[in-house]
Amino acid sequence: MVVSVAILGGSGYTGGELLRLLLSHPEVEVKQVTSRSRAGKFVHTVHPNLRKRTALKFVPPEALEPVDLLFACLPHGETAPIVDRLLELAPIVIDLSADFRLRDPAAYEQWYHWTHPRPDLLAQAVYGLPELHREEIRNARYIACPGCNSTTVILGLAPLFRAGLIDLDLPVTVECKVGSSGAGGEAGPASHHPERSGVIRPFKPGGHRHTAEVLQELTVCGRTPSLGLSVTSVEAVRGILATAHLFPKQPLTDRDLWQVYRAAYGQEPFIRLVKEASGIHRYPEPKILAGSNYCDIGWELDELPGGRQRLVVMSAIDNLMKGAAGQAVQAMNIRLGFPETLGLEFPGLHPL
Protein backbone atom coordinates (compact mmCIF):
# COMPACT_ATOMS: atom_id res chain seq x y z
CA MET A 1 0.00 0.00 0.00
CA VAL A 2 1.32 3.43 -0.95
CA VAL A 3 2.06 5.68 2.01
CA SER A 4 0.56 9.17 2.05
CA VAL A 5 2.90 11.97 3.12
CA ALA A 6 2.83 15.75 3.42
CA ILE A 7 5.54 18.39 3.79
CA LEU A 8 5.02 21.22 6.25
CA GLY A 9 7.22 24.07 5.07
CA GLY A 10 8.10 23.08 1.53
CA SER A 11 9.29 26.31 -0.07
CA GLY A 12 12.90 26.25 1.19
CA TYR A 13 15.86 24.36 -0.19
CA THR A 14 15.38 21.45 2.21
CA GLY A 15 11.68 21.20 1.42
CA GLY A 16 12.41 21.26 -2.30
CA GLU A 17 15.04 18.56 -2.02
CA LEU A 18 12.69 16.43 0.06
CA LEU A 19 9.93 16.85 -2.51
CA ARG A 20 12.34 15.87 -5.30
CA LEU A 21 13.15 12.63 -3.53
CA LEU A 22 9.61 11.77 -2.52
CA LEU A 23 8.18 12.33 -6.01
CA SER A 24 10.45 9.54 -7.28
CA HIS A 25 9.90 7.20 -4.33
CA PRO A 26 7.90 4.15 -5.46
CA GLU A 27 6.12 3.62 -2.13
CA VAL A 28 5.08 7.20 -1.39
CA GLU A 29 2.42 9.65 -2.56
CA VAL A 30 2.89 13.31 -1.70
CA LYS A 31 -0.54 14.69 -0.84
CA GLN A 32 0.25 18.26 0.21
CA VAL A 33 3.10 20.75 0.47
CA THR A 34 2.63 23.89 2.54
CA SER A 35 3.89 27.43 2.26
CA ARG A 36 2.20 30.38 3.88
CA SER A 37 3.78 32.98 1.59
CA ARG A 38 3.34 31.01 -1.65
CA ALA A 39 -0.02 29.34 -1.09
CA GLY A 40 -1.86 28.75 -4.35
CA LYS A 41 1.27 28.72 -6.50
CA PHE A 42 2.58 25.66 -8.30
CA VAL A 43 5.57 24.17 -6.49
CA HIS A 44 7.65 24.36 -9.67
CA THR A 45 7.52 28.16 -9.53
CA VAL A 46 9.76 27.89 -6.46
CA HIS A 47 11.54 24.61 -7.29
CA PRO A 48 12.02 24.87 -11.07
CA ASN A 49 13.78 21.50 -11.31
CA LEU A 50 10.40 19.90 -10.53
CA ARG A 51 8.63 21.34 -13.58
CA LYS A 52 6.54 18.58 -15.22
CA ARG A 53 7.29 16.30 -12.26
CA THR A 54 4.20 17.34 -10.29
CA ALA A 55 1.08 19.48 -10.54
CA LEU A 56 1.02 20.13 -6.79
CA LYS A 57 0.35 23.63 -5.53
CA PHE A 58 1.41 25.01 -2.18
CA VAL A 59 -1.35 25.14 0.42
CA PRO A 60 -1.43 27.16 3.65
CA PRO A 61 -0.44 25.21 6.78
CA GLU A 62 -3.99 25.43 8.12
CA ALA A 63 -5.18 23.35 5.15
CA LEU A 64 -3.11 20.28 6.06
CA GLU A 65 -5.10 17.06 6.13
CA PRO A 66 -4.28 13.79 7.94
CA VAL A 67 -1.61 11.61 6.32
CA ASP A 68 0.37 8.49 7.17
CA LEU A 69 3.60 10.43 7.69
CA LEU A 70 4.35 14.13 8.02
CA PHE A 71 7.66 15.86 7.31
CA ALA A 72 8.15 19.16 9.15
CA CYS A 73 10.66 21.55 7.57
CA LEU A 74 10.00 24.66 9.63
CA PRO A 75 12.62 27.07 10.99
CA HIS A 76 13.96 26.59 14.50
CA GLY A 77 11.42 27.38 17.18
CA GLU A 78 8.32 26.96 15.02
CA THR A 79 7.71 23.21 15.33
CA ALA A 80 7.68 22.72 19.10
CA PRO A 81 4.71 25.06 19.79
CA ILE A 82 2.50 23.12 17.34
CA VAL A 83 3.80 19.60 17.97
CA ASP A 84 0.47 18.34 19.34
CA ARG A 85 -1.26 19.41 16.14
CA LEU A 86 1.37 17.60 14.06
CA LEU A 87 0.88 14.39 16.01
CA GLU A 88 -2.87 14.68 15.40
CA LEU A 89 -2.27 14.92 11.65
CA ALA A 90 0.04 11.91 11.37
CA PRO A 91 1.01 8.87 13.45
CA ILE A 92 4.65 9.43 12.39
CA VAL A 93 6.39 12.81 12.25
CA ILE A 94 9.88 13.41 10.85
CA ASP A 95 11.08 16.82 12.01
CA LEU A 96 13.95 18.48 10.15
CA SER A 97 14.10 21.45 12.51
CA ALA A 98 16.34 21.63 15.59
CA ASP A 99 13.43 21.67 18.03
CA PHE A 100 13.68 18.08 19.31
CA ARG A 101 17.28 17.07 18.57
CA LEU A 102 18.60 17.67 22.09
CA ARG A 103 17.52 15.59 25.07
CA ASP A 104 18.39 18.15 27.75
CA PRO A 105 16.20 21.28 27.89
CA ALA A 106 19.10 23.13 29.53
CA ALA A 107 21.09 22.62 26.32
CA TYR A 108 18.50 24.67 24.44
CA GLU A 109 18.97 27.45 26.98
CA GLN A 110 22.75 27.28 26.55
CA TRP A 111 23.06 26.93 22.78
CA TYR A 112 19.85 28.42 21.42
CA HIS A 113 19.05 30.93 24.18
CA TRP A 114 15.55 29.49 24.05
CA THR A 115 13.27 28.05 26.70
CA HIS A 116 11.86 24.87 25.21
CA PRO A 117 8.04 24.95 25.32
CA ARG A 118 7.67 21.14 25.42
CA PRO A 119 10.52 19.66 27.46
CA ASP A 120 8.24 16.76 28.35
CA LEU A 121 8.55 15.44 24.79
CA LEU A 122 12.33 15.67 24.37
CA ALA A 123 12.97 12.19 25.74
CA GLN A 124 10.38 10.70 23.38
CA ALA A 125 11.95 12.05 20.19
CA VAL A 126 14.51 9.80 18.51
CA TYR A 127 17.67 11.39 17.11
CA GLY A 128 17.37 10.44 13.46
CA LEU A 129 20.94 9.44 12.61
CA PRO A 130 20.46 5.91 11.22
CA GLU A 131 24.07 4.79 11.63
CA LEU A 132 23.84 5.34 15.39
CA HIS A 133 20.11 5.00 16.15
CA ARG A 134 18.69 2.63 13.56
CA GLU A 135 16.87 0.34 16.00
CA GLU A 136 15.26 3.27 17.82
CA ILE A 137 14.09 4.74 14.51
CA ARG A 138 12.29 1.51 13.61
CA ASN A 139 9.63 2.11 16.26
CA ALA A 140 9.72 5.88 16.64
CA ARG A 141 6.70 8.10 16.44
CA TYR A 142 8.71 11.33 16.39
CA ILE A 143 12.06 11.44 14.59
CA ALA A 144 14.29 14.52 14.95
CA CYS A 145 16.66 14.73 11.99
CA PRO A 146 20.19 15.90 12.88
CA GLY A 147 21.74 19.14 11.69
CA CYS A 148 23.98 19.11 8.64
CA ASN A 149 27.24 20.05 10.37
CA SER A 150 26.53 17.72 13.27
CA THR A 151 25.81 14.82 10.92
CA THR A 152 29.16 15.33 9.18
CA VAL A 153 31.15 15.58 12.41
CA ILE A 154 29.41 12.80 14.33
CA LEU A 155 29.71 10.25 11.54
CA GLY A 156 33.40 11.01 11.18
CA LEU A 157 34.22 10.75 14.88
CA ALA A 158 31.74 8.39 16.55
CA PRO A 159 33.65 5.14 15.85
CA LEU A 160 36.82 6.58 17.42
CA PHE A 161 35.08 7.72 20.59
CA ARG A 162 33.10 4.51 20.97
CA ALA A 163 36.31 2.50 20.59
CA GLY A 164 37.95 4.57 23.34
CA LEU A 165 40.86 5.63 21.14
CA ILE A 166 40.82 9.38 21.78
CA ASP A 167 42.56 11.19 24.65
CA LEU A 168 39.69 13.07 26.30
CA ASP A 169 42.12 15.12 28.39
CA LEU A 170 43.12 17.01 25.25
CA PRO A 171 40.85 19.26 23.17
CA VAL A 172 39.25 18.19 19.91
CA THR A 173 39.10 20.89 17.22
CA VAL A 174 36.77 20.65 14.23
CA GLU A 175 36.29 23.01 11.31
CA CYS A 176 33.41 22.70 8.87
CA LYS A 177 33.65 24.35 5.48
CA VAL A 178 30.10 24.87 4.22
CA GLY A 179 28.36 25.86 0.99
CA SER A 180 25.87 28.68 0.66
CA SER A 181 22.73 26.51 0.58
CA GLY A 182 23.26 25.78 4.27
CA ALA A 183 22.10 29.33 4.98
CA GLY A 184 18.68 28.66 3.43
CA GLY A 185 16.78 30.21 0.57
CA GLU A 186 16.09 33.67 1.95
CA ALA A 187 18.29 36.39 0.47
CA GLY A 188 20.31 38.69 2.72
CA PRO A 189 23.43 40.88 2.75
CA ALA A 190 25.72 37.89 3.22
CA SER A 191 24.20 36.06 0.23
CA HIS A 192 24.27 39.04 -2.14
CA HIS A 193 26.38 37.87 -5.11
CA PRO A 194 29.13 40.54 -4.90
CA GLU A 195 29.52 39.73 -1.20
CA ARG A 196 29.23 35.93 -1.42
CA SER A 197 31.10 35.12 -4.63
CA GLY A 198 34.64 33.85 -4.08
CA VAL A 199 34.30 34.04 -0.34
CA ILE A 200 36.22 32.18 2.38
CA ARG A 201 34.46 33.77 5.33
CA PRO A 202 34.45 32.75 9.00
CA PHE A 203 30.77 32.23 9.74
CA LYS A 204 30.78 30.93 13.30
CA PRO A 205 34.31 30.49 14.72
CA GLY A 206 32.88 29.44 18.08
CA GLY A 207 29.58 28.66 19.75
CA HIS A 208 27.88 27.05 16.75
CA ARG A 209 24.57 25.49 17.78
CA HIS A 210 25.33 22.16 16.16
CA THR A 211 28.11 21.67 18.71
CA ALA A 212 25.41 20.65 21.19
CA GLU A 213 24.38 17.68 19.06
CA VAL A 214 27.98 16.59 18.57
CA LEU A 215 28.66 16.69 22.31
CA GLN A 216 25.45 14.80 23.02
CA GLU A 217 26.27 11.99 20.60
CA LEU A 218 29.99 11.72 21.39
CA THR A 219 29.59 11.55 25.16
CA VAL A 220 30.94 8.13 26.15
CA CYS A 221 30.51 6.55 29.60
CA GLY A 222 29.25 9.86 30.94
CA ARG A 223 32.31 11.80 29.81
CA THR A 224 31.84 14.67 27.35
CA PRO A 225 34.78 15.60 25.11
CA SER A 226 36.27 19.08 25.12
CA LEU A 227 35.28 19.78 21.53
CA GLY A 228 35.19 23.07 19.67
CA LEU A 229 33.46 23.55 16.33
CA SER A 230 34.17 26.35 13.85
CA VAL A 231 32.19 26.92 10.65
CA THR A 232 33.55 28.71 7.57
CA SER A 233 31.58 29.70 4.46
CA VAL A 234 33.27 28.82 1.17
CA GLU A 235 32.67 29.22 -2.56
CA ALA A 236 30.26 26.33 -3.11
CA VAL A 237 26.50 25.87 -3.19
CA ARG A 238 26.20 22.38 -1.72
CA GLY A 239 28.46 20.45 0.58
CA ILE A 240 30.23 20.28 3.92
CA LEU A 241 33.79 19.18 4.63
CA ALA A 242 34.52 18.63 8.32
CA THR A 243 38.18 18.42 9.35
CA ALA A 244 38.76 17.22 12.91
CA HIS A 245 42.05 17.31 14.82
CA LEU A 246 42.33 14.73 17.61
CA PHE A 247 45.01 13.13 19.77
CA PRO A 248 44.94 9.35 20.29
CA LYS A 249 45.58 7.84 23.72
CA GLN A 250 48.20 5.54 22.18
CA PRO A 251 49.93 5.63 18.78
CA LEU A 252 47.73 4.29 16.00
CA THR A 253 48.42 2.87 12.56
CA ASP A 254 46.40 3.11 9.38
CA ARG A 255 45.53 -0.55 9.84
CA ASP A 256 44.09 0.20 13.29
CA LEU A 257 41.87 2.89 11.81
CA TRP A 258 40.73 0.75 8.91
CA GLN A 259 39.69 -1.90 11.42
CA VAL A 260 37.77 0.56 13.59
CA TYR A 261 35.91 2.21 10.73
CA ARG A 262 35.16 -1.05 8.94
CA ALA A 263 33.79 -2.54 12.15
CA ALA A 264 31.52 0.48 12.58
CA TYR A 265 30.48 1.13 9.00
CA GLY A 266 31.32 -1.93 6.92
CA GLN A 267 27.63 -2.75 6.43
CA GLU A 268 26.38 0.83 6.20
CA PRO A 269 24.89 1.59 2.77
CA PHE A 270 25.69 5.31 2.83
CA ILE A 271 29.13 5.43 4.46
CA ARG A 272 32.21 5.22 2.24
CA LEU A 273 35.79 5.13 3.49
CA VAL A 274 38.00 7.26 1.25
CA LYS A 275 41.72 6.79 1.90
CA GLU A 276 43.73 6.33 -1.27
CA ALA A 277 47.49 6.24 -1.70
CA SER A 278 47.50 8.42 -4.81
CA GLY A 279 45.33 10.43 -7.16
CA ILE A 280 43.39 13.65 -6.70
CA HIS A 281 40.52 11.95 -4.87
CA ARG A 282 42.59 10.55 -2.00
CA TYR A 283 40.34 12.11 0.64
CA PRO A 284 36.65 12.98 1.01
CA GLU A 285 35.48 15.77 -1.26
CA PRO A 286 32.00 17.33 -1.02
CA LYS A 287 31.80 18.29 -4.70
CA ILE A 288 31.42 14.71 -5.92
CA LEU A 289 28.69 14.05 -3.33
CA ALA A 290 26.26 16.67 -4.67
CA GLY A 291 22.79 15.15 -4.89
CA SER A 292 23.79 11.92 -3.16
CA ASN A 293 23.09 10.57 0.32
CA TYR A 294 26.64 9.38 0.97
CA CYS A 295 29.00 10.41 3.72
CA ASP A 296 32.64 9.95 2.77
CA ILE A 297 35.18 9.57 5.59
CA GLY A 298 38.98 9.59 5.48
CA TRP A 299 41.92 10.29 7.78
CA GLU A 300 45.63 11.01 8.03
CA LEU A 301 48.05 10.32 10.86
CA ASP A 302 50.52 13.11 11.60
CA GLU A 303 53.67 12.28 13.58
CA LEU A 304 54.57 15.36 15.63
CA PRO A 305 57.91 16.33 17.21
CA GLY A 306 58.34 14.83 20.64
CA GLY A 307 56.64 11.57 19.77
CA ARG A 308 53.07 12.84 19.92
CA GLN A 309 50.63 11.77 17.21
CA ARG A 310 47.84 13.83 15.72
CA LEU A 311 44.90 12.23 13.95
CA VAL A 312 43.16 14.27 11.25
CA VAL A 313 39.70 12.97 10.29
CA MET A 314 37.90 14.32 7.24
CA SER A 315 34.21 13.71 6.51
CA ALA A 316 32.06 15.12 3.73
CA ILE A 317 28.38 15.19 2.78
CA ASP A 318 25.87 17.08 0.67
CA ASN A 319 24.23 19.26 3.31
CA LEU A 320 20.82 19.12 1.60
CA MET A 321 20.94 15.32 1.26
CA LYS A 322 22.69 13.37 4.02
CA GLY A 323 22.54 16.58 6.04
CA ALA A 324 18.78 17.03 5.63
CA ALA A 325 16.31 15.62 3.08
CA GLY A 326 18.18 12.45 2.14
CA GLN A 327 18.67 11.49 5.76
CA ALA A 328 14.97 12.14 6.41
CA VAL A 329 13.99 9.77 3.60
CA GLN A 330 16.49 7.21 4.89
CA ALA A 331 14.84 7.42 8.32
CA MET A 332 11.41 7.11 6.70
CA ASN A 333 12.50 3.96 4.87
CA ILE A 334 13.73 2.41 8.11
CA ARG A 335 10.61 3.40 10.03
CA LEU A 336 8.22 2.03 7.40
CA GLY A 337 10.16 -1.16 6.73
CA PHE A 338 11.22 -0.26 3.18
CA PRO A 339 14.70 -1.06 1.85
CA GLU A 340 16.89 1.60 3.43
CA THR A 341 18.33 2.78 0.13
CA LEU A 342 14.98 3.04 -1.69
CA GLY A 343 14.80 6.31 -3.61
CA LEU A 344 18.33 7.25 -2.54
CA GLU A 345 20.50 5.34 -4.99
CA PHE A 346 21.75 8.36 -6.97
CA PRO A 347 25.59 8.34 -6.78
CA GLY A 348 26.24 12.01 -7.49
CA LEU A 349 27.71 13.58 -10.63
CA HIS A 350 31.27 13.63 -11.93
CA PRO A 351 32.45 15.92 -13.28
CA LEU A 352 30.30 18.72 -11.94
Swiss-Prot record:
GO terms of molecular function: N-acetyl-gamma-aminoadipyl-phosphate reductase activity; N-acetyl-gamma-glutamyl-phosphate reductase activity; NAD binding; NADP+ binding
Recorded superkingdom: Bacteria
Active site: C148
Main location group: cytoplasm
Cell compartment(s), UniProt: Cytoplasm
Key words, A-Z: Amino-acid biosynthesis, Cytoplasm, Lysine biosynthesis, NADP, Oxidoreductase
Listed transmembrane segments: none
Keyword Oxidoreductase: yes
Reaction catalysed by this enzyme: [amino-group carrier protein]-C-terminal-N-(1-carboxy-5-oxopentan-1-yl)-L-glutamine + phosphate + NADP(+) = [amino-group carrier protein]-C-terminal-N-(1-carboxy-5-phosphooxy-5-oxopentan-1-yl)-L-glutamine + NADPH + H(+)
GO cellular component, one term: cytoplasm
Homology family: Belongs to the NAGSA dehydrogenase family. Type 1 subfamily. LysY sub-subfamily.
PANTHER family associated with the record: [LYSW]-L-2-AMINOADIPATE_[LYSW]-L-GLUTAMATE PHOSPHATE REDUCTASE-RELATED, N-ACETYL-GAMMA-GLUTAMYL-PHOSPHATE REDUCTASE, CHLOROPLASTIC-RELATED-RELATED
Protein name: Putative [LysW]-L-2-aminoadipate 6-phosphate reductase
Originating species: Thermomicrobium roseum (strain ATCC 27502 / DSM 5159 / P-2)
Encoding gene per record: lysY
